[in-house]
Amino acid sequence: MKLHELQPAEGSRKVRNRVGRGIGSGNGKTAGKGHKGQKARSGGGVRPGFEGGQNPLYRRLPKRGFTNIHRKEYTVVNLDVLNRFEAGTEVTPELLIETKTVKNVKHGIKVLGNGNLDKNLTVKAHKFSASAVKAIEAAGGKTEVV
């Protein structure tokens, strides 16, 4: 085999279909667009969601709710993440950021009760779920709202 004999693998290269290039191509004359009408014109077509003049679905459905601009976004920390700290440690939001356990803290940290905690820790955070408080205290630790 020589360099000039190299061929691409069968089926790896697809020839671009050149439309509107003669009747013999099978895609000449109207170039696969049919006859006349809005969709046959250059730049023609209807916008997404257009239903032929019928009131579209997005206008038939009522508006619901609103976005609260004062919403607080808490960074979530689960119990199984707290297991990486030594027993007796005071886990604060600053410590969590320092150890790169959490990042992008916007309005504070909320501790949730997902996973198991088997060390007694003093956990300080902005919010706690009821199950997290129960699990931390069951492990002999304390919770404190900052």
Swiss-Prot record:
GO CC annotation, single: cytosolic large ribosomal subunit
Sequence ranges of Basic and acidic residues compositional bias: 1-13
Chain segments annotated as coiled-coil in the UniProt record: none
The organism's place on the tree of life at top rank: Bacteria
Region feature Disordered, mapped onto this chain: 1-58
One Pfam family, short name: Ribosomal_L27A
SUPFAM superfamilies: Ribosomal proteins L15p and L18e (SSF52080)
Chain intervals with Gly residues compositional bias: 21-31, 42-52
UniProt function note: Binds to the 23S rRNA.
Family: Belongs to the universal ribosomal protein uL15 family.
Descriptive protein name: Large ribosomal subunit protein uL15
Native organism taxonomy: Bacteria, Bacillati, Bacillota, Bacilli, Bacillales
This protein's encoding gene: rplO
